[in-house]
């Protein structure tokens, strides 16, 4: 992206934002490059000059969204008045809001893009490392139980999410319901009494 003019960079960001909005609303397959071009009142050729195919567009959009989320959570967690439960509740609220805006079709179809799946697998490994650091903080602050093997908890939680996605459990119950039940089940299990009292803020 080095050497791009400000206009070209702005256009790239506009295409990315429009595309991800369309993908979230309609699923990936239903959205054509023509649709994105029409929405922005530009030519399809212009879109292809910047993004050579839909997978490239999807991958960059996911990376941008993940980076924005990570930066928000980092800023939130570094504020002096926020403890582990504040951070956990903020994480829950952000994810619940995000899921409310995404069609189940998006999750069905995103699994078909190999480069995207490779990116997500690597991202999940990094998230696991962050999770252990966060849990350690929560234990020290007295919100999470010190007598729990969190490597097992994280592994089981990850498999529960994977099962919900691969079995398409969200089609029957809805994305937010599935997310809420999986997350709250594991959070309740690791919280001390102090943590459980704070957890009432999202229940």
Question: Where on the chain are the PLM-derived regions?
Answer:
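Hydrophobic alpha-helical bundle segments that form small-molecule/ligand-binding pockets
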Residues: 125-153, 160, 164, 168, ...
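Short hydrophobic/aromatic patch on the recognition helix
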Residues: 41-51
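Short secondary-structure transition hinges
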Residues: 96-143
């Amino acid at each position: 992206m080095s050497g791009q003019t400000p206009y070209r960079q702005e256009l790239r960001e506009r295409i990315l934002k429009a595309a991800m909005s369309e993908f979230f609303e309609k699923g990936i397959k239903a959205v054509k490059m023509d649709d994105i071009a029409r929405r922005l009142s530009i030519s399809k050729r212009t879109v292809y000059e910047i993004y050579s195919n839909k997978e490239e567009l999807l991958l960059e959009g996911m990376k941008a969204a993940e980076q924005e989320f990570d930066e928000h959570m980092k800023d939130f967690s570094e504020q002096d008045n926020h403890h582990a439960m504040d951070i956990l509740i903020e994480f829950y609220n952000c994810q619940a809001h995000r899921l409310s805006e995404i069609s189940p079709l998006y999750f069905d179809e995103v699994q078909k893009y190999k480069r995207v799946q490779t990116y997500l697998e690597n991202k999940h490994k990094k998230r696991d490392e962050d999770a252990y650091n966060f849990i350690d903080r929560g234990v020290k602050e007295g919100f999470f139980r010190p007598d729990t093997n969190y490597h097992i908890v994280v592994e089981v939680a990850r498999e529960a999410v994977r099962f919900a996605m691969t079995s398409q459990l969200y089609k029957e119950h809805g994305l937010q319901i599935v997310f809420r039940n999986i997350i709250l089940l594991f959070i309740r299990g690791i919280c001390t009494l102090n943590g459980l009292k704070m957890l009432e803020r999202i229940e």
